[in-house]
């Protein structure tokens, strides 16, 4: 709060009330976006992490807001957050991350390491050569900074370069930027700046408000004080035409120092303060000629063609330096005029001042081109295609709950295996209360409903009958799978309506890929439902249960310890029969342990020790302490407890069924 107060005071003192108002609005907007991102917990495709503060709104608008709009037009969802408010938990809520002009921080380093652990890709976006002081040293304005300010600026530049090198690839706005960025990362996409829908609407509105006038207005919309040298380059020409043509007026917009040489024309100079971008189209539309000079430096060659596009959308012709993006995008004498020296600048200005038809001809051609090729809805495919090509396949495994059972453990094991194989794996549950599953190997957990999922999935896997509906109904899934682990119809007694609901999941005709962990399940799925089903064999964590000291030595002087395992609340587990058998045994010879993940023992059960919700990693110790496992469940597709008991050296008494 103290830091925020200091910024308010400094802005008010140095830049005035209008700047404070503008930055306050930007700050509030940014915080609202971040609050939404933290609170809504919605899974989306892309998170843009913005490294520019409220003092630089225009780069953020083009490289974050407009690129987000491009993605939306082509089916990818996104959110944004200011880099200082990035939280580690956000890594589970997105497929990929785009850092825009962000400096390296320890928090971001931790975030990227976690993203790599989860097989998620990280990109860097930058629209200026602010990644190495080799480039920024070419900005003359920086030499006017104090030593303290310059050090802070240079440190920030170096940290941006450091973060860039950590990313998988980069996205940028111009060819020269692409060339330089390839020195830092192996692959760089050029995604040129585009105009948003709102920009288009505001530009059309500004066009309708245009009025005829007797003056010829020239505009220089610098945007930044670092462009002082660019304007000074054409200053002699400006002075000459303003001296000769009395009808010429000069509009200066943004952070620019007015040269003393222009003071004699101050009655024909209109100075506009830095304006909100929404007012810029109307302001540009007031002029007849747009000036876009750039001194010939590598830093300037990397700059985008924004100023040309903004002017073209309100049918104002541009005279620009013949370098960088201007040279690439403007067709000389057709959609603009390109200049290489002062003489050409003079000729271009004279031509457009004297020839209104030429102004209209160039302006119309530029307008038509930019409407066709420079709008977000027209230019999103390459960005979406680039991101999708780089992303690892992602997989959503849908669970009914996280209550431990054999079926849940199987699904979780497959999730771990697929993550180790390089998949971007997430778990989903309707009533998930946790954000992460696992300790040593963490897997993101998401809420499974339409309001909380808004991203694409390559594969989604239903794990129990109750989860198939979610997988079928969520639209953004390329491949739908159903991991059948039992004949769940018989989980319910005759007359229960859930029997029908479970049974119909085995008869889905649509494009569901059936998988199973049991040959028994594979057979009845084919025979009774006509489903071709892939067999995914189960296994146990053998090393967790087996060791060289597992051989039992039954001591006749001690009681034989019998373990009963299963949920007595599920009738098909048939735990009651186990305890009916126990009641026939001699109490003096047999000690009874009962292990359940859910229900507690019934009053009539004879239990010497009750083991409730034992963590899976501790289960082997329970088996090792017991001599015999008694398993009377009537329905098993692949029964883990008998295998695990045998692996620890114990004996098993079980009902013969498909799983035993």
Predicted segments — roles?
Residues 332-343, 351-357:
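Conserved acidic donor-binding segment of nucleotide-sugar-dependent glycosyltransferases
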Residues 113, 147-169, 449-456, 495-516:
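Membrane-proximal helix-turn-helix segments that form the acceptor-binding/catalytic region
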Residues 47-49, 209-231, 235-239, 251, ...:
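Conserved donor-binding/catalytic core segment of Leloir-type glycosyltransferases
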Residues 254-286, 596-620:
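Nucleotide-activated donor-binding/catalytic signature segment of Leloir-type glycosyltransferases, i.e.
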Residues 292, 310-320, 651-654:
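Short hydrophobic beta-strand element within catalytic cores of glycosyltransferases
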Residues 295-296, 300, 634:
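Aromatic "clamp/platform" in nucleotide-sugar-dependent glycosyltransferases that forms part
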Residues 194-214, 492-496, 527, 534-558, ...:
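Acidic anion/phosphate-binding donor-loop and adjacent secondary structure
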Residues 357-387:
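A charged, aromatic-enriched C-terminal amphipathic alpha-helix characteristic of glycosyltransferases
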């Amino acid at each position: 709060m103290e830091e925020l107060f200091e910024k308010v005071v400094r802005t008010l003192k140095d830049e005035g009330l209008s700047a404070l108002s503008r930055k306050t609005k930007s700050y509030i907007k940014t915080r609202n976006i971040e609050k939404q991102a933290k609170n809504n917990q919605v899974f989306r495709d892309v998170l843009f992490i913005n490294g520019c503060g409220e003092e630089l709104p225009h780069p953020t608008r083009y490289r974050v807001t407009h690129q987000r709009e491009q993605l939306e037009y082509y089916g990818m969802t996104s959110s944004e957050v200011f880099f200082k408010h990035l939280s580690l938990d956000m890594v589970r809520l997105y497929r990929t991350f785009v850092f825009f002009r962000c400096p390296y921080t320890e928090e971001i380093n931790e975030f990227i390491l976690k993203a790599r652990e989860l097989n998620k890709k990280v990109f860097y976006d930058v629209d200026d050569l602010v990644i190495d002081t080799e480039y920024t040293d070419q900005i003359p304005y920086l030499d006017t900074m104090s030593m303290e300010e310059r050090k802070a600026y240079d440190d920030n530049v170096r940290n941006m370069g450091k973060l860039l090198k950590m990313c998988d690839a980069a996205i940028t706005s111009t060819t020269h930027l692409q060339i330089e960025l390839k020195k830092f990362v192996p692959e760089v996409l050029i995604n040129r700046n585009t105009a948003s829908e709102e920009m288009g609407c505001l530009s059309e509105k500004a066009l309708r408000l245009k009025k005829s006038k007797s003056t010829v207005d020239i505009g220089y919309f610098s945007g930044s004080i670092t462009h002082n040298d660019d304007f000074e380059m054409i200053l002699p020409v400006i002075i000459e035409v303003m001296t000769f043509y009395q009808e010429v007026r000069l509009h200066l917009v943004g952070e620019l120092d007015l040269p003393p040489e222009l003071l004699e024309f101050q009655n024909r100079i209109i100075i506009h303060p830095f304006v909100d971008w929404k007012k810029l189209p109307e302001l540009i539309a007031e002029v007849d000629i747009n000036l876009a000079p750039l001194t010939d430096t590598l830093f300037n060659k990397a700059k985008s063609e924004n100023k040309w596009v903004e002017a073209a959308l309100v049918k104002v012709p541009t005279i620009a330096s013949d370098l960088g993006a201007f040279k690439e995008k403007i067709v000389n004498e057709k959609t603009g005029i390109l200049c290489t020296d002062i003489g050409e600048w003079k000729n271009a200005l004279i031509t457009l001042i004297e020839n209104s038809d030429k102004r209209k001809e160039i302006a119309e051609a530029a307008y038509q081109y930019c409407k066709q090729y420079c709008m977000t809805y027209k230019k999103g495919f390459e960005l979406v295609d680039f991101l999708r090509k780089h992303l690892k396949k992602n997989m959503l495994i849908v669970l009914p709950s996280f209550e431990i059972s054999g079926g849940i453990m199987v699904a979780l094991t497959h999730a771990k295996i697929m993550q180790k194989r390089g998949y971007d794996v997430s778990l989903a549950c309707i009533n998930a209360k946790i954000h992460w599953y696992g300790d040593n190997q963490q897997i993101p957990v998401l809420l499974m409903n339409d309001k909380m999922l808004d991203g694409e999935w390559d594969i989604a896997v239903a794990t129990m009958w109750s989860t198939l509906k979610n997988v079928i109904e969520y639209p953004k899934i390329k491949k739908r799978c159903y991991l059948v682990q039992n004949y769940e119809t018989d989980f319910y007694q005759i007359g229960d309506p859930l029997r029908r609901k479970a049974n119909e999941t085995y008869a889905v005709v649509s494009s569901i890929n059936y998988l199973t962990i049991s040959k028994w399940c594979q057979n009845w799925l084919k025979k009774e439902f006509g489903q071709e089903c892939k067999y995914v064999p189960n296994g146990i964590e053998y090393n967790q249960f087996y060791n060289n000291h597992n051989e039992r030595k039954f001591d006749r002087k001690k009681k034989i310890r019998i373990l009963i395992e299963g949920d007595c609340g599920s009738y098909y587990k048939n735990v009651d029969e186990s305890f009916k058998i126990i009641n026939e045994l001699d109490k003096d010879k047999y000690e009874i342990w009962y292990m359940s993940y859910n229900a507690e023992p019934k009053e009539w059960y004879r239990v010497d020790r009750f083991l409730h919700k034992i963590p899976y990693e501790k289960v082997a110790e329970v088996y090792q302490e017991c001599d015999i496992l008694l398993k009377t469940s009537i329905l098993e597709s692949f029964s883990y407890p008998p295998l695990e008991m045998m692996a620890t050296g114990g004996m098993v008494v079980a009902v013969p069924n498909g799983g035993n």
